[in-house]
Amino acid sequence: MNRFFIVLIFAFSLSSLLGIQATEGKWIAPSDANHPNTWMTFRKDIILPKRPEKAVAQIAVDSKYWLWINGQLAVFEGGVKRGPTPKDTYYDEVDLAPFLQKGKNQIAILVWYFGKEGFSHKSSGQAGLLFNLESRKFVLGSDETWLCRIHPAYGSADAPYPNFRLPESNIRFDARKDMTGWQTTECPETLGFSNALVLGTWGEAPYNYCCPLKLKRA
């Protein structure tokens, strides 16, 4: 019996250490998003009966993200390079309550997928976003109902290329292809958005365990 309790305590401790938990959110991406230096856009609209006092989001990506709520930038350059272990992923915890409102809320996320490794980054090999938002009154998770598409304005620049130690690519931005107002448009489908592809759930390969990032964001 004592051995059972020791194993149980160890399992709970390990789960806490690795950030293992059940979430509504699933790993999602556009169906054609798996090339190095890919920029992806995601949209989800929700209706809230009132503004929550607290609404904590767990957000994990490969590799970086920017988050807007109702057109207001809530997270600038979120996420860090993968590598809590050779196979696992970090996630951010952010209270989004200050950005939410009664009624309609528009969630928009831009994700930058490095798609290659460096001395400080372990690529999962698959572009992806996992988003989970929890409040006392509701839970919202990323799934196939989210709309997404690759951002057409971003591309890779010509040589010279970054040093092989870096996973980032040089960026080319063609303003002629920009999707102005994609964060708040009432009909993302008119900009080419379509339903996301579900890649897996929390803890599944290739992203594996998600570990909480022990940093505070402004």
What are these regions (language model features)?
Residues 1-4:
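Positively charged n-region of N-terminal signal peptides that target proteins for export
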Residues 6-16:
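Bacterial N-terminal signal peptides
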Residues 30-40, 80-89:
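Extracellular beta-rich ligand/substrate-recognition surface
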Residues 46-49, 53-68, 107-109, 193:
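Aromatic-lined ligand-binding clefts that engage carbohydrates, nucleic acids, or primary amines
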Residues 66-124:
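Beta-strand-rich ligand-recognition modules
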Residues 23-32, 108-218:
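An acidic-aromatic loop/edge-strand motif
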Residues 36-48, 89-96:
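Short beta-strands within extracellular/lumenal beta-sheet-rich domains
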Residues 50-53, 97-106, 133-141:
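A short, structured loop/turn motif at beta-sheet edges
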